[in-house]
Amino acid sequence: LPWFYFSGACSESLFSVIGNQNVVKKVWLPTEVFPAATVLGQLVHFFLAMIVLVFFILGFSVFWDIPSGPEQGQALGFYILPGWEILLLPFLILLQTMLILAISLILSSLNVFFRDVSSINEIVMSAWFYLTPIIYPANFAREQLEEKGLSFLYWIYLLNPMTPITIAYRRIF
């Protein structure tokens, strides 16, 4: 879900200024409003999806009586019910939204001058998806790089701004 929020908001905000060029020409309005509105719209979708996820998690843990907690959950490889870290979720969402807003402002302004930004964005987002620990744990990347004697690349890997955010979401849920 965090990745869909990120990629959806960044991709949609590309055309937010160009799509509203009539409004920009007729009324004085800061152009930053359009990417911000797109990001906030995606944030609403993200909140709705998170509500569904929470009900799904609660449904699994309550109705099917799956044991929860670190001692039982480790046998399954994950925790069913989130711990105290769930209290950090609003701060994590705020941090992710600020990152998305910054990238969206940059992309939407670049797209005004260079129309190929949208094509490049698709390629970059596809590559970025695989460079972020979404479908694999971050420890897997570290272990693979250490095996090959390239442990210094792991620190470069951690410079990906979505990597710590994804790790934090995994820790919470």
PLM regions and their residue ranges:
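Transmembrane alpha-helical segments that form the membrane-embedded catalytic/substrate-channel core
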Residues: P2-S13, T97-S109, Y130-N139
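Short alpha-helical transmembrane interface motifs in multi-pass membrane proteins
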Residues: P2-S7, W84-L92, F152-W155
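Transmembrane helix boundary and interhelical loop/hinge segments in multi-pass membrane proteins
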Residues: Y5-T31, P35-L43
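Residue-level recognition of specific faces of alpha-helices
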Residues: S16, N20-K26, S109, F113, ...
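Hydrophobic alpha-helical transmembrane segments
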Residues: S16-P30, V54-I57, G69-G73, E122-E146
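Alpha-helical transmembrane segments and their short interhelical loops
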Residues: T31, T38-V124, W128
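Short hydrophobic, aromatic-rich alpha-helical segments embedded in or entering the lipid bilayer
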Residues: Y130-F173
